[in-house]
């Protein structure tokens, strides 16, 4: 993988589309956008967190950014073979700044570029949190991606009144079983408690193939970016 920047020129209708791939946060210029999952700030957090290698693809027309796509190659070490696993994770399908441009075409070019780059070091690429399941469908298929059904469970805690009514019977049984076995729920207030909580979650998620809990350093860098 290149160490800093790579640039490709593609044809987007009558206007050439330039794809620039960034591998170092120090080389990323000021970019527009408000999507946290494709931001320069998250790129730098990935860069500073052990086990993460960020890749940022910026699409430009006439030297003006029209879209960007942030991905991260994550390395995990497991007790069972293969001991070291690298996978690329992307949240969403990027952020776009030109409402008149064809987002599907731009995404197709960025996706192909990302696929070629990421598969050099990772064994799979996973896109999560897709807002529109049909957006980019043809591009995903053309690049050999497959759809995976995934169950999402969301329990709103904005109102604590009658919160049990929003839980499923199986979830309530799990909670009661945990309380019966001595589980406690309380806020972590000190750095030591937060560290212990993070270590516990990493231990729980370490045996799960599709789930991951980042290093505590990820959240420390996130806090530094927000304060």
Which positions does each model-derived feature cover?
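Acidic, Ala/Val/Gly-enriched low-complexity intrinsically disordered segments
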Residues: 4-7, 14
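Compositionally biased, intrinsically disordered low-complexity segments
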Residues: 8-11, 88
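A conserved beta-strand-loop-helix scaffold within acyl/acetyltransferase catalytic domains
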Residues: 11-62, 66-78, 130-154, 158, ...
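Acyl-donor binding region in acyl/amide transferases
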Residues: 76-147
């Amino acid at each position: 993988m290149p160490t800093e920047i790579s640039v490709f020129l593609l044809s987007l209708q009558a206007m050439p589309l330039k794809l620039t791939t960034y591998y170092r946060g120090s080389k990323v210029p000021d970019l527009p956008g408000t999507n946290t999952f494709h931001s320069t700030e998250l790129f730098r957090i990935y860069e500073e967190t052990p086990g993460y290698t960020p890749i940022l693809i910026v699409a430009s027309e006439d030297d003006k950014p029209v879209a960007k796509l942030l991905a991260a190659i994550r390395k995990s070490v497991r007790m069972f073979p293969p001991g070291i696993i690298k996978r690329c994770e992307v949240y969403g399908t990027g952020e776009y700044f030109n409402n008149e441009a064809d987002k599907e075409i731009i995404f197709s070019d960025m996706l192909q570029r990302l696929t070629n780059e990421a598969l050099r070091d990772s064994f799979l690429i996973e896109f999560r949190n897709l807002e529109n399941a049909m957006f980019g469908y043809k591009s995903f298929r053309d690049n050999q991606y497959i759809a995976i059904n995934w169950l999402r469970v969301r329990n709103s805690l904005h109102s604590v009144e009658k919160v049990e009514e929003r839980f499923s019977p199986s979830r309530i049984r799990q909670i009661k079983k945990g309380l019966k076995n001595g589980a406690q729920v309380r806020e972590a207030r000190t750095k030591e408690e937060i560290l212990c909580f993070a270590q516990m979650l990493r231990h729980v998620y370490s045996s799960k193939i599709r789930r991951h809990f980042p290093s505590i350093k990820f959240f420390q860098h996130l806090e530094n970016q927000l304060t």
